Each structure stands twice: as C-alpha cells, then as structure tokens.
C-alpha cells in the first residue's frame, strides 16, 4: 500500500539517517527570488530583507523534523524581528507526490502555527537548487550585507523531541549576527528529511 507523505517521512526518519546540512560557507551571498506567498503576494529577497539580517528557511508542512521545531521557529522569528532580522520560509517539495505539501496545505500550516513571517512556494524548485538546500528544515542565516553566517540547527532533538534548555542555537546565532554581523564559528548542522525533488 502506498504511504502518504508524513507516514513515508516518519518511516524514513526512523529507518534512514536524516540528511545533514553542509558546513556554513561563510560570506556566500544570498540569491534573489520572486515567489508567491500563502497570502498571494509575489515577494523578492529585497521585500523580505531585514535591517540587521535575514533568515531564509527551507521547510515543508509534513516533515516530522520540521514539526518538531515549528514552535521554536515561530517564537525565535518573533524575537529576531524585534532586533531587525526578518525571516522567510520556503517550501520547495514536490506537491504532486507529497500532497500534504500543497499550496493549500501551506496556507493551513502557516495559519495553524501562527506564522509571523511569509511562507513562499518554490514550485519549480529552482530557488532550492540555487541555494543548494538539502533537507527540511534547512536554515540560511544572513547578515545585513546578505552574506551567509549561519547554516546550523534550531536546537538539539532527541528522538524528534526538542531539548529545550534555554535559547535555541538558531536564536543565539542570529542574535550574534544582529550584533556583530558575524555568525558563530562552531555550528551544529540541521538535519531532516531530504527535499522531495521532482523526478521528471
């Protein structure tokens, strides 16, 4: 019997090692995009850029690794906005084979979790490829000059349960970027289910 997206992802997350993000390529410039948000607006990098930095997150609706840290992401992004860092989330998964990641479900997911940041759809997957995004969630933290300074995790997960022992790695790193324009030297990779690439 065929498995729906989340079941497949959960199966993958228990039996297959999650994909880890590569080491931060410090100084790499952010790439421009023009993508539709769940509110029906076409947004570019210039539209979402923050005064002190910008956080670009590749996520999706169904992945258990994303769901495990959604609460942290939402809370962290609110705190970051207060210090001049804007955030944006992008879903690039193949919605045809993973209907839980459809645009309609993106709208639902963003409302249910009270996203205070835009949630964009990358239907062609071009932007995910340009950024070399590998998994969900995959975080790209940029300084005010749009130079990459963070490519790490939100926080530690034990069996898909967040270890909440103070501020998250993501929040601490982005706060440091807001203050110094530089991310931490030591970063622990994010990990999750691979982006669901289209096969045709």
Where are each of the predicted segments found?
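Single conserved hydrophobic/aromatic residue that forms the stacking wall/gate
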Residues: 1-13
């Amino acid at each position: 019997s065929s498995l729906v997206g989340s079941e497949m992802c959960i199966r993958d997350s228990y039996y297959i090692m999650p994909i880890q993000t590569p080491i931060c390529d410090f100084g790499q410039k952010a790439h421009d995009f023009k993508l539709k948000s769940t509110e029906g607006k076409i947004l570019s990098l210039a539209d979402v850029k923050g005064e002190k930095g910008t956080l670009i997150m590749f996520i999706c609706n169904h992945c258990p690794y994303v769901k495990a840290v959604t609460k942290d992401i939402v809370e962290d992004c609110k705190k970051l906005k207060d210090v001049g860092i804007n955030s944006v989330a992008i879903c690039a998964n193949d919605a045809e084979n993973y209907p839980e990641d459809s645009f309609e479900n993106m709208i639902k997911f963003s409302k249910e979790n009270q996203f205070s940041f835009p949630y964009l759809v990358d239907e062609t997957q071009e932007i995910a490829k340009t950024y070399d995004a590998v998994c969900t969630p995959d975080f790209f933290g940029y300084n005010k000059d749009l130079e990459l300074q963070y490519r790490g995790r939100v926080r530690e997960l034990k069996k898909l349960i967040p270890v909440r022992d103070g501020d998250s790695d993501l929040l601490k790193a982005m706060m440091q970027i807001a203050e110094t324009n530089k991310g931490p030297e030591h970063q622990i990779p994010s990990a999750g289910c691979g982006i669901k690439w289209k096969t045709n």
